[in-house]
Amino acid sequence: MTETRQAAPPHPAAPGPAGDGAVGDGAPRRPALSPSRAADFKQCPLLYRLRAIDRLPEAPTPAQVRGTLVHAVLDRLYALPAAERVPAAARALVAPVGAELCAADPELAAVLPAVLTTAPDGHAEVDRLLDAYFALEDPRLLEPEAREQLVEVERESGVPLRGYVDRVDALAGGGYRLVDYKTGAAPGPAHEGRALFQMKFYALVLLLLRGRAPRELHLLYLNGPLALRFTPDEEQLRRFGRTLDALWAAIRAAGATGEFRPNPGPLCASCTHRVRCPAWDGVPPPYPGWPEPG
């Protein structure tokens, strides 16, 4: 898999008039492997358990709320006619899209207004991230074939894979491109492993669903701005699938016994579940057992 790093390519500001992105918490579903849950287990098996099995609530952070809003605005931007996909249109979508998110999710409704109005540079930060997007791509030139798409597949090994894909673009001459937006800080070259893991994960899922791998993987860091572009290799993706098999086997083994051990480290300082962690003299709730579909 080859990689290209590109900081703010020289797209001019789009001219023209102003005009008009995890599986939800509905009915319980059997656990499946996703990039975020895989990262949780590798970071701390107990964290995985509390999120994926106990499903303990966590209040969204301001950064997460901003990310949710920016993803939703970019998704809505692509519903506009191509000529209207300009920076002013994206900024104009913030208020109505934010209102829709609040109406659909009480947790967001409790946090989003404060993030936009009282947090330091709240609304300005959302606008800055949206403006940065236009430094990386010109959406007037793109016509996605899928946006904010839930993808699910079961490998031949029985490992269930699940997640949301931000965008899939059809490419001239055949093939397709997988695009993911990030609103957090861009990693340095030595710390791209987690982001690359996620892109490989979704590329493998699409390979299994479509029978062919993406021709391109684009990871767009709006807080940079920085574009990372990868060219996937199908055989490498299939080897990566065997890595996921091993990871899922470890999760299922822990699930059978309830032995999800804590793994103390620097990230403990910001962990919501530290009060329940034995490594910090906390007591986790009784293990409810591995969830099975009803």
Regions found by a protein language model. Name each.
Residues 32, 205-294:
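Metal-dependent nuclease catalytic regions and adjoining charged, substrate-binding loops involved
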Residues 149-240, 244:
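Mg2+/Mn2+-dependent nuclease catalytic core
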Residues 62, 66, 70, 122, ...:
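Hydrophobic (often cysteine-bearing) scaffold residues that line and stabilize catalytic clefts
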Residues 69-80, 250-254:
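Solvent-exposed, amphipathic alpha-helical segments
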Residues 1-64, 293-294:
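C-terminal, charged and often intrinsically disordered regions of DNA end-processing helicases
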Residues 63, 67, 112-120, 261:
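Conserved phosphate/pyrophosphate-binding and hydrolysis machinery centered on Walker-type P-loop NTPases
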Residues 54-63, 80-84, 188-189, 258-259:
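Short, polar/flexible loop-turn hinges at active-site or ligand-entry regions and domain interfaces
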Residues 73-147, 154:
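A non-catalytic, helix-rich entry segment at domain boundaries
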